[in-house]
């Protein structure tokens, strides 16, 4: 679940097509990923993406063809700025 409050602005730094799907890398800049683990969700321009790799200064996510067909993600390019929000946890203050 997300609040809709943007925590940081990141940047798309890599796009790797895989069949009809896509793997993308987001550089997070000022977003603290210290509490993020593989499998966590991060809203990226409002699209809920699951973290599959954590290289240190960002994250990788796999995007299905269904997500590509039903969001604006297909139009994202390397260099596209994206709004970021980590998913809420049971301990998150609202």
For each predicted feature, which ranges?
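Conserved loop->alpha-helix
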Residues: 1-94
């Amino acid at each position: 679940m997300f609040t809709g409050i943007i925590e940081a602005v990141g940047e798309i730094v890599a796009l790797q097509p895989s069949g009809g799907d896509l793997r993308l890398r987001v550089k997070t800049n000022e977003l603290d990923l210290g509490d993020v683990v593989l499998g966590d969700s991060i809203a990226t321009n409002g699209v809920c993406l699951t973290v599959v790799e954590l290289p240190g200064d960002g994250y990788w996510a796999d995007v299905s063809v269904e997500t590509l067909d039903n969001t604006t993600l297909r139009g994202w390019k390397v260099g596209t700025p994206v709004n970021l929000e980590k998913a809420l946890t049971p301990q998150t203050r609202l």
